[in-house]
């Protein structure tokens, strides 16, 4: 006997919708709980089975917290700007807005079919002008505080496509689409000064309950380094340049220096005989992406400029080279090379026959770089010193001589905040003919994205907005002509603050009401993929800290607890993808097995954080368990089974209280697979009984409801209730019912186990000894022997020594 999920699930989804069951309560006498999913990009492909894993986890927590008497904020929305919609528009001539709306409608249908308890009244969409008005407002505040600025930045320019490409869209120097040549070209871009927040982004990781590996990824991305900035003079010139080094104590071993090919001094210092080689090398580098340039495994390339620098610590002349592995945007765009103690410098020196001088004792630098620690050698006043002392002494000397100073640098770069795209938030800036740049007045926000009948590349590297002359060209009241900014914001913009808008989604006066922000922040639990470890999570923390500084939000950090669900792989253990043909569509699973089965299966596959292969047999097993529950509790006619009575049943008492305690604890700690195991154990016990107390059945159904809400609502109705199960007080357990009143005793002869018995826990020593001697197996083993001694350890064992 089985239940009909095709009838039952739509019935309860309609009930929840009509009764607005999951509308966020804002009762001042209750605690608040904010459970957040990383909102999806509504792609044309729709949901895949990986999406519901994280969504089910937050839904279980949300449903449990409502039953535990909390106000629960559990919202959903759409991160709907982005490249795929624009690409679709360029390829088909269709409107990205219409395409996006269709995708959102499909995602909404799919999400509702899975029974998630979202408050749909709070739905947001990053492409809605009432939403992006506030994204633009935040940009304006950043600009006013000097944290948004323009800079010339090298981008991936594809002349054939007439557009700028992201690093991911470039493969081996060619565009992913069409295979056209791509060049590095400096272009005017908007930048956000995230580096101003580097220390706080680092230090405040201590305030949050996040996986340590994610914290480490952010720490490494920010990459705080302490060291010194050292000034080198160029021989026979007034020019100087600076390098940053974490090891100023190795300056005596610096035997050459390397510039990034884009360094501004190269043209000035290159000698006539090296000019041609330098120009050719620079052209070659233009075709390479940053990843290709810094690949440690590749052969080192470079070219000598013909110029020399003076090593400031010993006055030696050292050659100046250029090489692609030095990037202009990192540090100063120039490095001092100490080949004896750095692997990359060593390989470069070997390739080009440059001098290698050891300054630390240890290793054999004729064979490989020595990267360990040792006392200093060949280093004049630093000789004999260990690393820490030598660094301090070197910096002190540099500062005294006025040729260097202590410095902290970061690997973190400022955030490149503009895209040469149409489908994004317009940047609310006007460039005037007299050179002034102004913001669009706050009372004129949102600056609307104009409708375009055809989206096509501008051909100049600007976004397609540059083609819309009526929109771009403006005149102020004094007749001064200007051009609107044609770059748009990146997709990361809308997702950097969306969790704030859910708190007060219809506020037209502010991002959200201050009092409401104080009540709901920080987010209690945020669940999503680990792939967002550095970009989204770092950008959101940056914007949140900025909004904290200007008094908009009351907390330093946005997300108190973060959890990353694992990936659901294809049946062959490979990542699911269209090209592999192993993508599982949740619609098909819901049709065949039901949403409750899908939810149960995804939570029971294994630990939430593990990556696990999809398995059809596992789905069938999940459905069988739900059918087992149904058969136990419901008759063929659909009424409550006769074995469910109001009578007590001592045999089930301990199992029930143990289940309530364990399941509650495991749900709280996101250990859903082991929580479900406890539900299964209880059902196995219940099948062995002639009667099951109705109170226990109700408690069980409540514990089941966050996982399988449709089935739970149906069972709750069959149990005689007319209201939804969603707000019924969560079951409690009695600790005294968990105490064992019986205990297993091991019986031994001469220290070897011969038998085991179960006895009352309260049994005295003498009683235990008597029972042990009367045990049949013990009698067999003691036959013909004389008992010399009896050792009794109450609650554990009886050992009879005999010979």
Swiss-Prot record:
Protein's gene: leuS
**Database matches in CDD domains:** Anticodon_Ia_Leu_BEm (cd07958), LeuRS_core (cd00812)
Positions of short motif 'KMSKS' region: 575-579
Q: Name one GO cellular component term.
A: cytosol
According to UniProt, the reaction catalysed is: tRNA(Leu) + L-leucine + ATP = L-leucyl-tRNA(Leu) + AMP + diphosphate
Protein family per UniProt: Belongs to the class-I aminoacyl-tRNA synthetase family.
**What Pfam families does its record include?**
Anticodon_1, tRNA-synt_1, tRNA-synt_1_2, tRNA-synt_1g
Native organism taxonomy? Bacteria, Bacillati, Bacillota, Bacilli, Bacillales
- Keywords annotated in UniProt: Aminoacyl-tRNA synthetase, ATP-binding, Cytoplasm, Ligase, Nucleotide-binding, Protein biosynthesis
EC id? 6.1.1.4
The species this protein belongs to is Listeria monocytogenes serotype 4b (strain CLIP80459)
Question: Quick one: which residues bind ATP?
Answer: 578
Q: What is this protein called?
A: Leucine--tRNA ligase
